[in-house]
């Protein structure tokens, strides 16, 4: 059970606030020339706690805390932005900001010159930011602002107003609008907003997958052809949409943190490239030759062989990766069979075909439409089990080119992993019987 966060004293919070103000003051003082005494005195006066807070409470009205923004839709649009906390939709299965929960990070829009106020309200203290303390109407936070209770409450109201929509909700002529039909002749007119908090979260995930230390280590292991406890993700054909030009801060704070970049995943239909496939006529098994020698299957079996040889580091991640590789090889076998079924039915009846009978029944199913004997063998024979056993025998030979694997303590574990995947493979073949 998580212990509740301790409530800070007003003295602690006040010191925390003053440290922030003094840090900003020092940065400005360091830039002054020795003879700029007037500017120095002005800075000292405006950075006294109550003077700075009074100015911040005035300028906070130039900002709004948001989760959904309008400017990315069109930079000249002048309409409402929303701060909408995550709520599960009525219909399950919909992706959106509601899935972020506590991971949601709010954005801020408005006058970029007032962003120091947002940084002030974002100060983290004992697991909460200052805005949270003020929103919860913490007595300690109020007293930390000012000894004058009325003044402190006035400033609090100004600061927590950063989450409210300025004026009445409004769209704009440059905003996009969608007509959503209703039963009958009615419709909803929707004005979509940019989900800035969700986009920022996805951007962080993509950035970690592309440039994070864990992904980098996995890629380096692959280039060295070494096993690794986890894989990495690739996101090909990303497009970059720029918001704000040379001034991304004019769009929003989070947009500025992303340097104005919005990464777009390709939403295109699959571009299937038809592969030429020839009937396997000259060999008794496709596993040893036509299928087993395809580039992808060869790559998978080599990788699996290396994982089986890792007897020293036999942890859960390695076992899961081995099972995943076997499943991928099974998938390749099923895809190979699907490609062969595009051939003219009955190719396995050609006199020159040397393919084993069980593999003929598996790979040339439409032959049963014109060959009654073949149909009966396919319906009643035990060819799914035979094909599964032939697949298992081939895979064992493919990944155990040296005696180290067959004689190692890993043999029992490998047999169990293979048996599990093989059972699923046979079940799929059994479903294809009809």
Curated annotation (Swiss-Prot):
A Pfam family of this chain: Cas_Csy1
Any GO BP annotation: defense response to virus
Knockout or disruption consequences: Mutants lose phage DMS3 infection-dependent inhibition of biofilm formation while there is normal biofilm formation in the absence of phage infection. Decreased production of crRNA in the presence or absence of phage. Disruption of the entire Y.pestis-subtype CRISPR region disrupts crRNA production but does not alter phage resistance (possibly OLNs PA14_33350 to PA14_33310, and the flanking CRISPR loci), indicating this CRISPR is not involved in phage resistance.
CDD domains the UniProt entry points to: Csy1_I-F
Region spans: Disordered: 76-97
Segments passing through the bilayer: none
Family stated for the protein in its record: Belongs to the CRISPR-associated Csy1 family.
NCBIfam families xrefs: cas_Csy1 (TIGR02564)
Other observations noted: In this bacteria, Y.pestis-subtype CRISPRs do not confer resistance to phage DMS3 or MP22, but instead are required for DMS3 infection-dependent inhibition of biofilm formation and possibly motility.
Subunit structure: Interacts directly with Csy2; part of the Csy ribonucleoprotein complex with a probable stoichiometry of Csy1(1),Csy2(1),Csy3(6),Cas6/Csy4(1)-crRNA(1). A Csy3(6),Cas6/Csy4(1)-crRNA(1) subcomplex is also formed.
Protein function: CRISPR (clustered regularly interspaced short palindromic repeat) is an adaptive immune system that provides protection against mobile genetic elements (viruses, transposable elements and conjugative plasmids). CRISPR clusters contain sequences complementary to antecedent mobile elements and target invading nucleic acids. CRISPR clusters are transcribed and processed into CRISPR RNA (crRNA). Cas3 and Cascade participate in CRISPR interference, the third stage of CRISPR immunity (Potential). Involved in crRNA production or stability.
Protein name: CRISPR-associated protein Csy1
């Amino acid at each position: 059970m998580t212990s509740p966060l301790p409530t800070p004293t007003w003295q602690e919070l006040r010191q925390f606030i003053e440290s922030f103000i003094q840090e900003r003051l020092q940065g400005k003082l360091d830039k002054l020339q020795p003879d700029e005494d007037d500017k120095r005195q002005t800075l000292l006066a405006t950075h006294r706690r109550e003077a700075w807070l009074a100015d911040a409470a005035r300028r906070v009205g130039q900002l709004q805390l948001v989760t959904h923004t309008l400017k990315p839709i069109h930079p000249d649009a002048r309409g409402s932005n929303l701060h909408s906390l995550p709520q599960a939709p009525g219909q399950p299965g919909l992706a959106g900001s509601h899935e972020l929960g506590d991971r949601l990070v709010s954005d801020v829009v408005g006058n970029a010159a007032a962003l120091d106020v947002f940084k002030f309200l974002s100060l983290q203290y004992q697991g909460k930011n200052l805005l949270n303390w003020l929103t919860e109407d913490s007595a300690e936070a109020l007293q930390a602002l000012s000894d004058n209770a009325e003044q402190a409450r006035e400033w609090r109201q100004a600061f927590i107003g950063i989450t409210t929509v300025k004026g009445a909700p409004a769209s704009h002529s440059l905003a996009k609008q969608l007509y959503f039909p209703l039963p009958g002749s009615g419709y909803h007119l929707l004005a979509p907003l940019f989900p800035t908090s969700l986009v920022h979260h996805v951007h962080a995930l993509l950035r970690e997958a592309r440039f994070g230390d864990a992904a980098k280590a996995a890629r380096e292991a692959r280039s060295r052809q070494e096993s690794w406890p986890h894989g990495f993700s690739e996101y090909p054909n990303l497009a970059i949409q720029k918001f704000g030009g040379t001034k991304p801060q004019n769009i929003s704070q989070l947009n500025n943190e992303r340097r104005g970049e919005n990464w777009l995943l390709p939403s295109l239909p699959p571009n299937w490239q038809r592969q030429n496939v020839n009937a396997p006529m000259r060999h008794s098994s496709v596993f040893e030759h036509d299928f087993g020698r395809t580039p992808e299957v060869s790559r998978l079996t080599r990788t699996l062989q290396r994982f089986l040889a890792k007897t020293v580091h036999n942890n859960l991640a390695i076992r899961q990766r081995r099972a995943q590789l076997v499943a991928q090889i099974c998938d390749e076998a099923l895809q190979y069979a699907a490609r062969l079924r595009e051939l003219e039915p009955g190719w396995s009846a050609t006199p020159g075909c040397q393919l084993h009978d069980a593999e003929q029944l598996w790979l040339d199913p439409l032959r049963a439409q014109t060959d009654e004997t073949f149909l009966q063998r396919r319906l009643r024979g035990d060819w799914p089990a035979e094909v599964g056993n032939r697949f298992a025998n081939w895979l064992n030979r493919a990944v155990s080119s040296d005696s180290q694997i067959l004689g190692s303590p890993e043999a029992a574990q490998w047999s169990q992993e293979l048996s599990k995947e093989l059972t699923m493979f046979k079940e799929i073949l059994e479903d294809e019987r009809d």
